Swiss-Prot record:
Major location (coarse): membrane
Source organism of the structure: Shigella flexneri
Assembly behavior: The complex is composed of two ATP-binding proteins (LsrA), two transmembrane proteins (LsrC and LsrD) and a solute-binding protein (LsrB).
Membrane topology listed for this record: Multi-pass membrane protein
Protein name as catalogued: Autoinducer 2 import system permease protein LsrC
Domain of life: Bacteria
């Protein structure tokens, strides 16, 4: 049973999402509707994109805590370009390139300069946030064109164009990681760095690609944020990095690298977003959101740690079972045979 749970974390995450959707329905039947699902998905798109990028980094046994700042910086660039008169396609491409460049810089610090990922990205977290504030002067960016907001308008089945793009990206990345040699290189790099090198995997390049794509996903999340809100705050993206990591852990992405799936991270992002909608239904103040999400994350981390320890004990017991088998007992001679011998 323990091995099944460890090997099928996506199923347990899906069950958690289903339960969190069904149980509030007993309080309000209107909650159980397609409209609720589309609303939750619309709210979850930013976190889903960030969780997909974070998955790539975590699979290589690294972590990136700067994605919130990258999201904010890229959203600011998008707003500045649009207000300067550039077309939406040009502004979006420039925004994605900035995210890619920011992620590449993070990857170069980790792969080439051998700086620990948590230290490197803590530094760039402040760097990118500072660039964002320098560009805006600490002010909001408003007056964004209506065509940007159309990206988040319902298009088909209540889902926006950018929502369908997110679904396509999820499917593509799930296929890439599961079915291609390039995708398996991420797992190999995180599972055994030296072994991957001996197999010919270019581990430095893989880590740089992981960070670069993570930055690109953060930039896309910035575009989604701007299109949904319609303006850009001077604190856009603050705290999103922790939620992205939490979504990955909830979905079964190992902090030790080398295991997990994109689908699990997506379900984790959905679960965290759905918590917010349930709290609204229960009329619980919004400042409880982070507290409850933190409790859920701690519970999952404790469960994950206990599960890993239990599996290791079982594997150790199976490995040394033949050395621990007691010797066959020798039956004592019967009293009759003893008398004859006498």
């Amino acid at each position: 049973m323990l091995k099944f749970i460890q090997n099928n974390r996506e199923i347990t995450a899906l069950l958690a999402v289903v339960l969190l959707f069904v149980l509030p329905g007993f309080l309000d039947r209107q909650y159980l509707s397609v409209q609720t699902l589309t609303m939750v998905y619309s709210s979850a798109q930013i976190l889903i994109l960030l969780a997909m990028g974070a998955t790539l980094v975590m699979l290589t046994r690294n972590i990136d805590v700067s994605v919130g700042s990258i999201t904010g910086m890229c959203a600011v660039l998008l707003g500045m370009l649009l207000n300067a008169g550039y077309s939406l396609p040009v502004a979006c491409v420039a925004t994605l390139l900035l995210g890619l460049l920011a992620g590449f810089f993070n990857g170069a610090l980790v792969a080439w300069l051998k700086i620990p990922a948590i230290v490197a990205t803590l530094g760039t977290l402040g760097l990118y946030r500072g660039i964002m504030l320098l560009w805006t002067g600490g002010k909001w960016i408003e007056g964004l064109p209506a065509e940007l907001k159309q990206l988040s308008a319902p298009l088909l089945l209540g889902i926006s164009a950018i929502g369908w793009l997110t679904i396509i990206l999820v499917a593509f990345m799930a296929w890439l990681l599961a079915k291609t040699a390039f995708g398996r290189s991420f797992y190999a790099t995180g599972d055994n760095l030296q072994g991957a090198r001996q197999l010919g995997v270019r581990t430095e390049a893989i880590r740089i690609v992981a960070f670069s794509l993570n930055g690109c996903m953060a930039a896309l999340a910035g575009i989604v944020f701007a299109s949904q809100i319609g303006f850009i705050l001077n604190q856009t993206g603050t705290g999103l990095e922790m939620k992205a990591i939490a979504a990955c852990v909830l979905g079964g992405i190992s902090l030790l690298g080398g295991s997990g799936a994109i689908i699990g991270a997506v379900l984790g992002a959905w679960f965290l977003t759905q918590i917010d909608s349930v709290l609204v239904l229960l009329r619980i103040p919004a400042w409880w959101n982070d507290f409850i999400a933190g409790l859920v994350l701690l519970a999952v981390l404790v469960f994950d740690g206990r599960l890993r320890c239990a599996l290791e004990r079982n594997l150790r017991r199976q490995k040394y079972a033949r050395f621990m088998t007691p010797p066959p007992s020798v039956k004592p001679a019967s009293s009759g045979k003893k008398r004859e011998a006498a």
